[in-house]
């Protein structure tokens, strides 16, 4: 059964501007070291950052809490299976809340163009 569903669109130019303006403090607040390393390995890194940003926003919506109760951006980490399929790992307060809700399966889909990134997250029991 679906416990939560979240969808988000991130504007690539907006994410690029935030990274260029705020630099490392912004990156460290929003992205995990693994996510930063992954995005930086691509020529189109800002599209990758925007995709992960959208995934984190969509995850927060699926969780149903907003950015309150101690939930942080880095509590949501986008990882990849060997096949390249994106998966979502939860830590910290996000993991505690998901466990309390009975979340046992998380589905994540991310797509992007040069200007936008979209992510959808489904939490299931």
Model-derived regions: residue spans:
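Core catalytic alpha/beta fold that binds nucleotide/phospho-ligands
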Residues: 1-125
């Amino acid at each position: 059964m679906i416990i939560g569903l979240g969808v988000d669109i991130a504007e690539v130019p907006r994410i690029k501007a935030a990274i260029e303006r705020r630099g490392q403090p912004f990156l460290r607040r929003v992205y995990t070291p693994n996510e930063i390393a992954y995005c930086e390995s691509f020529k189109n890194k800002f599209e990758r950052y925007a995709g992960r940003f959208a995934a984190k926003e969509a995850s927060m919506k699926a969780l149903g809490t907003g950015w309150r109760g101690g939930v942080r951006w880095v509590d949501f980490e986008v990882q990849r299976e060997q096949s390249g399929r994106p998966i979502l790992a939860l830590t910290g307060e996000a993991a505690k809340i998901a466990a309390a809700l009975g979340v046992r399966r998380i589905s994540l889909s991310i797509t992007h163009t040069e200007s936008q990134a979209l992510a959808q997250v489904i939490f299931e029991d």
